[in-house]
Curated annotation (Swiss-Prot):
InterPro entries xref list: Connexin, Connexin31, Connexin_CCC, Connexin_CS, Connexin_N, Connexin_N_sf
Record's function text: One gap junction consists of a cluster of closely packed pairs of transmembrane channels, the connexons, through which materials of low MW diffuse from one cell to a neighboring cell.
Family recorded in the similarity comment: Belongs to the connexin family. Beta-type (group I) subfamily.
Involvement in disorder: Erythrokeratodermia variabilis et progressiva 1: A form of erythrokeratodermia variabilis et progressiva, a genodermatosis characterized by the coexistence of two independent skin lesions: transient erythema and hyperkeratosis that is usually localized but occasionally occurs in its generalized form. Clinical presentation varies significantly within a family and from one family to another. Palmoplantar keratoderma is present in around 50% of cases.
UniProt name for this protein: Gap junction beta-3 protein
Annotated spans, Disordered: 250-270
A single BP term in Gene Ontology: cell-cell signaling
Location in the cell: Cell membrane; Cell junction, Gap junction
Broad class of the protein's primary localization: membrane
Length: 270
């Protein structure tokens, strides 16, 4: 995926997000994606190469490394970023589905018919539920990966010395040393902190979305000026019925022209 495609996706996500969603997207892109791309490979690229153990037993170093690092940190963070950003794409797909449905409706019934959606990107109906479930899915993914990161490495700290005990083919207890542990510890805390900020922003957006829906429901029954949703639905239904009658030949598509010719039969319509 090139930068233009990524920019287009991020622009689409930003367009249909709330204020909290836009801040969340900025944090993800600046403090997680860019930092991951720029610094992760340099910090964690040599983790297995410079993992030294005080033994010459063949295969012992690899076994100790696999015992302490069952999965690489950078690969775990890459999976986390992929799974966290995927729910936002579902919102874009839902909006695209609405726009395509609206286009087919206008093409079939004409431009005079009422619209199916006043605004395809407005979070009402099914799109609201899609957006809500996307936020819940983000929270689940964030908490799940933080739990995995804390469980697999026994906390977020990065020790300088790890010991392999009773791990074949290593003899007895083997001491192993991690390369650049302080730098890796700082980087780990930074990524965990960015993930925690994203969790707080997602919870705020979730509360905002629910409160906004409740307030809109409370004010829904109040009388408002202008055209009501029921009148729009009535116009859409009338338009569809008229369209079907025209196709069946039961209604003249231009009744005004017939009246004109009945009053002046010698006139030629222009």
């Amino acid at each position: 995926m090139d930068w233009k495609t990524l920019q287009a996706l991020l622009s689409g996500v930003n367009k249909y997000s709330t204020a909290f969603g836009r801040i969340w997207l900025s944090v993800v892109f600046v403090f997680r994606v860019l930092v991951y791309v720029v610094a992760a490979e340099r910090v964690w690229g040599d983790e297995q190469k410079d993992f030294d153990c005080n033994t010459k037993q063949p295969g012992c170093t690899n076994v100790c490394y696999d015992n302490y690092f069952p999965i690489s940190n950078i690969r775990l963070w890459a999976l986390q970023l992929i799974f966290v950003t995927c729910p936002s794409l579902l919102v874009i797909l839902h909006v695209a589905y609405r726009e395509e449905r609206e286009r087919r409706h206008r093409q079939k019934h004409g431009d005079q018919c009422a619209k199916l959606y006043d605004n395809a990107g407005k979070k009402h109906g099914g799109l609201w539920w899609t957006y809500l479930f996307s936020l819940i899915f983000k929270l689940i993914i964030e908490f799940l990966f933080l739990y995995l990161l804390h469980t697999l490495w026994h906390g977020f700290n990065m020790p300088r010395l790890v010991q392999c005990a009773n791990v074949a083919p290593c003899p007895n207890i083997v001491d192993c040393y991690i390369a650049r542990p302080t730098e890796k510890k700082i980087f780990t805390y930074f990524m965990v902190g960015a993930s925690a900020v994203c969790i707080v922003l997602t919870i705020c957006e979730l509360c905002y979305l629910i409160c906004h829906r409740v307030l809109r429901g409370l004010h829904k029954d109040k009388p408002r000026g202008g055209c009501s949703p029921s009148s729009s639905a009535s116009r859409a239904s009338t338009c569809r019925c008229h369209h079907k009658l025209v196709e069946a030949g039961e209604v003249d598509p231009d009744p005004g022209n017939n009246k004109l010719q009945a009053s002046a039969p010698n006139l030629t319509p222009i």
